[in-house]
Regions:
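Residues forming the flavin
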Residues: 2-416, 420-422, 426-470
């Protein structure tokens, strides 16, 4: 076991940062540079998160590092003296709502107690079921982009579908790996000129990036359909074709394409389970329907020693995640008597405000998930699998929700086992919330321990610790 992954059974630090993506790395670096003892925990084998995920040496030699700045940031974090615990899964919180419970790469129990906790747990892709989504060859855009960066060609003919600005770069990444992208299907109309699109002129760099993606797709003859969603994936042993229909008119077929790869995703959801276990107050975002922590502009939660940063505070992209991580660290330093430069804090606040403006523009251009997801869920045919882990259909979820006492999400889960598989409702959660009898968006999937699947030995080890009740 490397120095990065070796850990005793109990650890203490000034600050524990959970998640080694852009936000967690930025926060850990700022805190360590100021002299704090910082622990950085991440479940992946190497720090960097999904955004800065670095391929192995053999892939680097073959295709290069598409985000070398991530490797440089990780090197600075290590040089600053941050104790990096790779391969450590934070799966719960002790009864004191302060001590973190984790499992080491070998499955050993690890308890972490720190004066400050920074939750930089990231986000996961928002999936919405459709007939055939369980077929091999149907993947999320994030997985497709990650595998493309690793030099892997997932298929020969693909459709990229869903909603959000992420679809275009994913389609371009597939093209770079030799995949024939036959179409991009966007549920909204973000590329139609209108008052909202004029706001993009205030962000010329982002506009140029979007234009470069669009130009690349045009050169390859990729058709971009707007107001279009996946109605059904067809195939026996794997996906063979996809039917696209109008989002505004489900009976109107736009196209049917033969494919062996279908990438579908509707943006990202903040991974806020850990803050919820720590007792942080949360709200429902009316635009996305997501449960988000209630935070100050610097990421401080309702629990004074807990900060939530990056995508866990609301999906907004890597530049915002980096800035949020630094802002939280500077606020912690101010609270702990290590006064940071006030000018730097002001400049960072201005930068965050500018980034927030772009996030608002994106939200205005694309359909609100709080409306999009329920609309798609309502039109699901009864036999469609909603929970792929436990093989639960839309009919079964609707029946459980209509039963007496079954109108909240936990009751639906208890009556059907939907959301009780390995993904713990990360895939089917939005559909469960939309299909419940109480109406779309009025119930949420609760945060439960363990947050992640873990070896039974880790739980038994804690249970054998004097004074511990697990």
């Amino acid at each position: 076991m490397s120095a990065d992954t070796a850990a005793p059974a109990a650890l203490t630090a000034d600050a524990a940062v959970v998640g080694a993506g852009p936000a967690g790395l930025a926060a850990a670096l700022e805190l360590a540079r100021a002299g704090l003892d910082v622990l950085l925990l991440d479940e992946q084998a190497e720090p960097g998160g999904q955004y800065y995920r670095r391929p192995g040496p053999e892939v680097l030699d073959a295709v290069g590092d598409h985000r070398p700045e991530g490797g440089r940031l990780v090197a600075r974090v290590r040089a600053a003296g941050v104790r990096v615990l790779s391969g450590h899964t934070v799966w719960g919180v002790d009864d004191d709502r302060r001590t973190l419970l984790a499992a080491s790469p070998g499955g050993a129990a690890v308890r972490v107690r720190a004066r400050w906790v920074v939750a930089a747990t990231g986000a996961y892709e928002r999936s919405v079921p459709f007939p055939g989504w369980q077929l091999p060859g149907v993947v999320t855009p994030g997985l497709a982009q990650h595998m493309s960066a690793e030099g892997v060609r997932l298929g020969r003919r693909a459709v990229v579908a869903g909603s959000g600005p992420f679809l275009l770069p994913v389609a371009c990444a597939l093209l770079e790996r030799g995949v024939r992208v036959v179409a991009v299907a966007e549920a909204g109309r973000p590329y139609t000129p209108g008052p909202a699109s004029l706001g993009a002129l205030r962000f010329p760099a982002r506009l140029a990036e979007l234009a470069s993606y669009a130009a690349r797709l045009a050169r390859h003859g990729v058709r971009v359909h707007q107001d279009t969603v996946v109605a059904r994936a067809h195939g026996a042993d794997r996906v063979e074709a996809v039917t696209l229909t109008r989002f505004s008119d489900p009976e109107r077929v736009v196209a049917r394409h033969g494919v062996d790869l279908l990438c579908v995703g509707y943006g990202f959801r903040p991974q806020a389970d850990l803050p919820r276990l720590l007792g942080c107050a949360v709200d429902r975002d009316p635009a996305t329907g997501d449960t988000v922590p209630r935070l100050t502009p610097t990421g401080r939660s309702s629990v004074p020693h807990v900060y939530v940063v990056g995508e866990a505070a609301g999906a907004a992209g890597a530049p915002t995640a980096l800035a949020r991580g630094r802002a939280a660290a500077l606020d912690i330093l101010a609270s702990s008597g290590r006064a940071p430069d006030r000018g730097e804090r002001r400049r960072l606040a201005v930068h965050l405000a500018s980034l927030a403006g772009f996030t608002r523009l994106t939200a205005a251009l694309y359909p609100a998930p709080a409306e999009l997801v329920p609309a798609l869920a309502r039109r699901l045919p009864g036999p469609t699998l909603v929970c792929r882990c436990e093989c639960v259909t839309a009919d079964a979820v609707r029946a459980a929700a209509a039963a007496e006492g079954g109108s909240d999400v936990p009751a639906v889960k208890g009556g059907t086992r939907a959301g009780m598989g390995l993904c713990q409702a990360r895939e089917c959660g939005p559909a469960l919330e939309a299909l419940r009898a109480g109406g779309p968006g009025t119930g949420t999937v609760p945060a439960r321990v363990p947050l992640r699947p873990l070896p039974l030995a880790a739980v038994l080890e804690l249970a054998d610790t004097p004074g511990e009740d697990v």
